C-alpha cells in the first residue's frame, strides 16, 4: 500500500509551464531533472506548479506546502530590484516573477525551508531587497577571468567555486572546493535581507548564499549552479537535496 503523502513541495517550472496533476508527478512534461532530483530522496513528494493555478488559489494552496524550491529559468525582471534594463539584454517572465515573489514572501513569513537554484538563487535575494548584475561581462570587473556561460548559449560550462567553511553549505557538502556547472549571465551583487554569500568563483562572483547564522534556525540556501543536472554523475550533489528535504520533513 502506497504510503500517505506527508510532504508537499512547491515547484515553479523551469523555462516552460507544464500540465501538472496534483496527485502525481507522472504528468510532468518538462524539467524532469528537478523532479528526479527531488525523487532521488523521496519519490512520494507531490510537486505543485503554481503557474498552473489561478491567483485566487495561491494563498489556500500554499497553506498545504512544507517547503519552496525556486528553480532556474529566464532573467529576473530588473524592476524587481529597482533598476531599468540598462543593456536591453534581459529576457524576462513578469508572470513568473509575480508568482515567485508571492511564494517567497509566503515562505519567509511561514519560516519554510527554501532552496533556490540559479534564477531561484537570484530571486531569493532580490525578493528580500537584494540586487543583481544585469550582465556579468559588462558590469563585473576582475583580473581573473571565469566563463559563466557558453557564448553560444547552448551548453553548460564548468568552473571551480570555494565555499565558506563556516557555512551550512560547507557542512552539507563537506568540502571547501566544488567544480560546478554554469549557465548564467547575471549574478547576485548585493545579498537581500539576512542572506550572506557563502561561495564564490575565482573572479569573486557570488555562487551561493544562505540565511545568516544566529538569526533563527530557518533553512534558506541559494546556489547559482544546477545540482539537479550534476547529481546523477556526481553524487555529492545529492547531499544538498537530502539536507533540504530533511529540513522540510524532519
Language model regions located:
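Active-site glycine-centered loops adjacent to acidic/histidine catalytic or metal-binding residues
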Residues: 118, 184, 226
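Phosphate/adenylate-binding glycine loop and adjacent helical scaffold
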Residues: 179
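C-terminal closing repeat unit and adjoining cap/tail of repeat-based domains
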Residues: 217-219
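Conserved beta-strand residues within beta-sheet cores
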Residues: 182-185, 194
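Active-site nucleotide/adenylate-binding loops and adjacent lid/helix of ATP-dependent enzymes
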Residues: 175
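N-terminal beta1-alpha1 cap of cysteine-dependent amidohydrolase-like domains
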Residues: 2-11, 15-115, 125-133, 137-166, ...
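The feature captures the ABC ATPase H-loop/switch
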Residues: 121
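Active-site-proximal beta-strand elements of phosphoester/diester hydrolases
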Residues: 221-225
Amino acid at each position: 500500500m502506497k504510503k500517505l503523502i506527508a510532504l508537499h513541495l512547491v515547484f515553479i517550472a523551469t523555462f516552460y509551464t507544464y500540465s501538472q496533476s496534483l496527485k502525481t508527478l507522472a504528468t510532468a512534461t518538462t524539467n524532469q531533472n528537478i523532479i528526479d532530483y527531488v525523487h532521488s530522496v523521496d519519490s512520494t513528494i507531490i510537486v505543485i506548479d503554481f503557474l498552473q493555478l489561478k491567483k485566487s488559489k495561491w494563498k489556500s494552496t500554499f497553506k498545504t506546502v512544507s517547503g519552496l524550491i525556486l528553480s532556474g529559468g529566464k532573467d529576473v525582471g530588473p524592476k524587481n530590484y529597482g533598476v531599468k534594463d540598462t543593456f536591453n539584454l534581459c529576457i524576462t517572465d513578469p508572470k513568473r516573477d509575480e508568482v515567485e515573489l508571492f511564494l517567497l514572501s509566503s515562505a519567509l513569513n511561514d519560516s519554510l525551508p527554501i532552496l533556490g537554484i540559479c534564477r531561484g538563487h537570484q530571486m531569493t535575494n532580490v525578493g528580500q531587497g537584494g540586487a543583481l548584475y544585469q550582465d556579468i561581462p559588462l558590469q563585473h570587473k576582475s583580473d581573473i577571468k571565469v566563463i559563466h556561460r557558453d557564448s553560444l548559449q547552448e551548453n553548460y560550462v564548468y568552473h571551480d567555486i570555494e565555499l565558506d567553511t563556516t557555512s551550512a553549505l560547507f557542512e552539507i557538502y563537506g568540502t571547501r572546493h566544488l567544480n560546478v556547472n554554469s549557465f548564467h549571465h547575471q549574478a547576485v551583487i548585493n545579498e537581500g535581507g539576512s542572506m550572506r554569500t557563502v561561495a564564490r568563483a575565482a573572479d569573486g562572483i557570488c555562487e551561493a548564499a544562505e540565511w545568516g547564522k544566529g538569526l533563527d534556525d530557518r533553512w534558506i540556501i541559494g546556489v547559482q549552479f544546477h545540482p539537479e543536472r550534476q547529481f546523477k554523475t556526481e553524487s555529492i550533489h545529492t547531499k544538498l537535496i537530502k539536507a533540504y528535504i530533511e529540513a522540510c520533513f524532519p
